[in-house]
């Protein structure tokens, strides 16, 4: 570790970072932020390459391999940015000039800090950004209300999959499960639609706490029962079981990665293989998932259909919607062709 200050130039910081040297900042907080931004601009692959007018970003012929290389580049970028450290005093407080008050954001994310520590500046900025999401909330048209994600919980900024859940006709049932509830947004939609009893599960204690606060604030806390467990409530059945698993197979390296990447499709396959044992007679499962993995060559449609059949299930229906989020229409995205072709679907699954 090397102690550095405002005199450190970005090119020198990049050289130190690529050599594996961590830099403990002792200068001005805002100058540290500027240095972090400058360091990010120097990392190869940090920004899309400039193209001539009308030229689109296109991956190579093996889009799946391109995507994994892209993830590796982003992982390297994250490691290099994490080399800039800032000191924290107990509480915590950032022990630098012109530093913001971080006590509320840090305590909400990690609890009180009993002794001095050092943390990557980019991690601290992530904590502060997440706290703003928690305070302001995310507008969810399907609820006509807001959801307030906690640190480590995925913000439901894409509304199309929630619209599918809100608009699909409900089966005749009084009980539903929401598997992997996260912020509680799907459980809230089901409760608002008139399901008498919703059991929402998640393995993460952060998610359970986040969902509990959201459901109470939305006035459905007495309808939704939260259970911290892996996948299904043990020994229970419902007429409707909903699951919105992470959409891409791949390793999850951060808390937020866990909402996007499903290692070896574990959660998707666990939902399919366990669904029959947790459906009431006449019940159905709703699998809410994007086909982006198929567009990227990470999974085939035949694989998904094979897993459904192997689980003793059949597809009773499917409702599709085309995403309209920013990255779906961004020609500078390195995977624009895949993202622009993406479809999000609600698969209705019943016993075969």
Predicted features by range, described:
Residues 270-271, 296-312:
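Short alpha-helix
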Residues 102-175, 179-181, 185-189:
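SAM-dependent Rossmann-like transferase core, predominantly class I methyltransferases
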Residues 304-351:
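Class I S-adenosyl-L-methionine
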Residues 245-270:
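Mobile active-site "lid"/loop adjacent to the S-adenosyl-L-methionine
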Residues 158-243, 249:
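Conserved SAM/SAH cofactor-binding pocket of Class I
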Residues 267-281:
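A short glycine-rich, Lys/Arg-flanked "PGG" loop and its adjoining helix->strand segment in the class I
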Residues 1-138:
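N-terminal auxiliary segments of SAM/dcSAM-dependent transferases
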Residues 282-289:
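Conserved beta-strand signature within the Rossmann-like core of class I S-adenosyl-L-methionine
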